[in-house]
Amino acid sequence: LEAVPDTAEEVIAAIRAAGCQVGISIRPGTPVEAVFPYLGVVDLILVMSVEPGFGGQKFIPTTPTRIAAICAERTRRGCDTLIEVDGGINTETGPLCIAAGADWLVAGSSLFHAMDPAAVVNVLHSK
């Protein structure tokens, strides 16, 4: 959303015209209300739970509250936009995000640096 704040609607329309699904992302400092107008318009909202740029960062603890707010608004609007979370996802933070309403998780460092990656996937899938 931050990349094209003044032309988001045009970009969404162009992506749709190309026959593709549309997702938008928000950084940790962006108020979640900024994505509310796009619920039901885009297919996915990616909530960044770290500052974008590099892997291995610590999960920002306010992320579940942000997810819950988007989820509540999604329910209020009766739409099915997916909520995805990326950044600092592991076997502790992933379940918090799922409990808050996330549909998808992106697990990078915690998965690829694990002694048993399959065990990490199993824990995340079980929540």
Predicted regions and their residues:
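A short hydrophobic/small-residue beta-strand
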Residues: 22, 104-105, 111
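Short Gly/Pro-enriched loop/turn and capping motifs at secondary-structure junctions
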Residues: 51-53, 88-91, 111-112
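Conserved anion-binding
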Residues: 1-82
